[in-house]
Amino acid sequence: MSIIDSTTGANASNLPLSPLLVILGNTGSGKSALAINLAKVIPAGIINADSRQIYSRMDIATAKPTLSEMLEIPHYLYSFIQPDQPFSLAEYQTLAYQAIDSLHTQNRLPVLVGGSGQYLKAVLEGWSIPPVAPDETFRAALFEKAEKEGGDVIFTELEKKDPQAATQIDPRNIRRVVRALEVIHKTGGKFSGLLIKNPPPYRVFKIGIHIPREELYRTVDLRVEKMLEQGLEAEVRSLLEKGYKASLPSMSGIGYRQIAKYIEGGISLTEAVEQMKFETHRLIRQQNTYFRLTDTNIHWITLEESRSNGIIQLVCDFLAAENKNEIH
């Protein structure tokens, strides 16, 4: 019997729910490496839950899996959106569910991997995204304000109007901050209050990789240096030469924004690198609002444990425990 055979029929009330493994944690914590190692032993497919890794042509600063890794193991929702192509949270949620169902059909374990809390919550909690039509005039005014005064200004506005929504949205993702403010503006209510939850019929096991903050800071600082060595400047130059403007939401990601500013003469390369490190540290702190060590629904492991055979046994135990919601 395959690993999924015993859980087929997730929508039938008298049958066990189909399994979904989630690997989460801070940027630079080794999530992708763990997922790939597991998929080499257990029939599985990897689904991206990182809002930066959806874009094509943007590989180095987003730290995507390598091409050889993607060819060896089924990967979903990586590099499928052009840098100037609009893409909504609702679209991601729909595609993620399709990928999960596809893997179940293939008798493979779906492994949802990423550090974008909003992507993870939208899928795991079954958010019903508010169907509010865009207000282009309102949007344009906010984007202009963010460009002139900085994204922090409009994020602060969101924090005042809807503190709960502010904890669920990456402050660097200007497009999503604008969308939340737009919904608040058009409905008169809170964006967070409009998110109706309808959890999908999956038996979920969440594994979180925890690395002490100072150790993680050192790790990501070294990764920033490595990105420069791998050709990040050339990658950003290529994007700009192809007509992808630095003001695009995709270009607001760490690494692209700073190197674009350096290329355009706004800052030195040294300043760009320091800003990349600072923003990565900030992202780690932001992610910690999503991924808390006190969350008993997450099975936390160390980096060393993520590299051990014990983690494989843990996942096998999860697959064997059809009627349990947690593995301890």
UniProtKB/Swiss-Prot annotation:
Q: Return the annotated region ranges for Interaction with substrate tRNA.
A: 50-53
Q: In its keyword annotation, does this UniProt entry include S-adenosyl-L-methionine?
A: no
Q: List the residue(s) that the UniProt entry marks as the site Interaction with substrate tRNA.
A: S116, R139
Where, in this chain's numbering, is ATP bound? G25, N26, T27, G28, S29, G30, K31, S32
Q: Which reaction does it catalyse?
A: adenosine(37) in tRNA + dimethylallyl diphosphate = N(6)-dimethylallyladenosine(37) in tRNA + diphosphate
Which GO terms of the molecular function aspect are on file? Answer: ATP binding; tRNA dimethylallyltransferase activity
Top-level taxon of origin: Bacteria
Signal peptide location: none
**What HAMAP family does the annotation carry?**
IPP_trans
Tell me its family.
Belongs to the IPP transferase family.
Q: What is this protein called?
A: tRNA dimethylallyltransferase
Annotated source species: Dehalococcoides mccartyi (strain ATCC BAA-2100 / JCM 16839 / KCTC 5957 / BAV1)
